[in-house]
């Protein structure tokens, strides 16, 4: 499906942060007083084997779900806001044409050795005309994919390929000028779909000013869409607010947060662009840690977080470097407190040296191993 990317600044090498919002990936939970008392029980030699087994099981139950535990245990099932309590979702943006999304998703999954949890797609706000359906949320292909995946729908206030006059503005959206033909129509489509979906409005909004309006205009437009959905009885949307996470935009990002009552998840998109923006090579940790800590300190200290796009350019002089980068992902991810989803961007950005897709078999094999980690394999139901 065709889509336009907003201009995205690269992420400069971050300054050192205290890491106060990060957790030790190797930290284990306390067994609790009940388990400790049971361990202190005196048992007879005739029952030692069974008693030890009972104590071990009690210890596990008292500790709660183990970080990264997979399976169908009731306490690892997703919450009402689609949070996986025992780990994190793995998803991706998979390049596709209008009609072949299911096939492209299956091909990606075959290559990476597992099913995706979240499939990420993009839409504009154009009106349906003839065969055009870029503005149609939940296409037939998305519905097919959604039978056994979660969907993240990115909805942009654009008319791709349209005239300047056709481009929606945040002020128009906030004033309700798009309600009848756009907002209400798509709200009803989502309501009819029934299953919960992640929905993002104007991702990377900090790159869209002043062309689309002011930060205040964005907040009003976002809140209007949210309130309009609620008025129409749409209760199966998980509202996902996605910024670049580029810290030179920190003031702008803070102004564009719609508020805790309007946001369920907070996402950010950080990459190792390398030569794409003539930047130095950044590890996965360097692309994530500073932004993660800033968001926890300045936007929300408790909302679930999503690495809504992550990835790296390749290094032509060191073909193994991309593979080494992806190998770091599980270990770093476990230390990012509150991060409950990570979506790989398997495509390119505009510009020379800006192909962020997996470049070779070694990179694919590395990602395959990384996303086989139990932490990234959680029950969808």
How should these model regions be labeled?
Residues 54-76:
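C-terminal region of N-terminal signal peptides and the immediate post-cleavage residues
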Residues 79-96, 197, 304-381:
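Substrate-binding cleft of secreted/luminal carbohydrate-active enzymes
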Residues 93, 202, 226, 230-251, ...:
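Aromatic-lined carbohydrate-recognition surfaces of secreted/lumenal glycan-active proteins
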Residues 115-124, 153, 253-283, 345:
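Aromatic- and acid-rich polysaccharide-binding/catalytic face
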Residues 37-62:
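Secretory targeting and sorting signals
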Residues 130-241:
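Substrate-binding cleft of extracellular glycoside hydrolase catalytic domains
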């Amino acid at each position: 499906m065709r889509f336009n990317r907003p201009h995205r600044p690269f992420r400069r090498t971050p300054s050192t942060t205290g890491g106060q919002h990060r957790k030790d990936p190797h930290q284990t939970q306390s067994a609790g007083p009940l388990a400790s008392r049971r361990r202190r029980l005196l048992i007879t030699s005739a029952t030692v084997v069974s008693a030890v087994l009972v104590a071990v099981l009690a210890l596990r139950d008292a500790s709660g779900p183990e970080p990264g535990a997979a399976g169908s245990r009731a306490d690892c099932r997703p919450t009402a806001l689609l949070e996986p309590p025992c780990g994190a979702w793995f998803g991706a943006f998979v390049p596709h044409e209008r009609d072949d999304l299911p096939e492209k998703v299956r091909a990606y999954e075959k290559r990476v050795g597992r099913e995706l949890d979240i499939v990420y797609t993009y839409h504009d706000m154009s009106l349906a005309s003839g065969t055009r359906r870029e503005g149609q949320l939940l296409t037939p292909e998305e519905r097919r994919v959604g039978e056994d995946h979660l969907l993240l729908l990115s909805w942009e206030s654009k008319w791709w390929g349209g005239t300047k006059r056709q481009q929606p503005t945040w002020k128009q959206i906030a004033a309700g000028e798009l309600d009848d033909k756009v907002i209400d129509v798509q709200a009803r489509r989502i309501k009819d779909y029934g299953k919960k979906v992640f929905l993002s409005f104007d991702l990377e909004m900090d790159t869209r000013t002043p062309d689309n309006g002011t930060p205040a205009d964005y907040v009003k437009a976002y809140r209007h869409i949210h309130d309009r959905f609620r008025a129409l009885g749409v209760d199966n949307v998980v509202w996902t607010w996605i910024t670049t996470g580029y810290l030179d935009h920190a003031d702008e990002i803070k102004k564009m947060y719609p508020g805790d009552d309007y946001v369920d998840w907070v996402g950010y998109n950080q990459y190792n662009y390398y030569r794409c923006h003539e930047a130095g090579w950044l590890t996965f940790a360097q692309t994530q840690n500073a932004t993660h800590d800033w968001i926890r300190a300045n936007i929300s200290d408790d909302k679930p977080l999503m690495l809504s796009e992550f990835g790296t350019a390749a290094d032509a002089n060191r073909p193994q470097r991309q593979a080494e980068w992806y190998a770091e992902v599980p270990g770093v991810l476990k230390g990012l407190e509150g991060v409950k989803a990570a979506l790989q961007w398997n495509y390119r950005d505009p510009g020379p040296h800006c192909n962020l897709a997996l470049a070779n078999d070694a990179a694919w094999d590395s990602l395959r191993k990384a996303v086989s980690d139990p932490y990234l394999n959680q029950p969808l139901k």
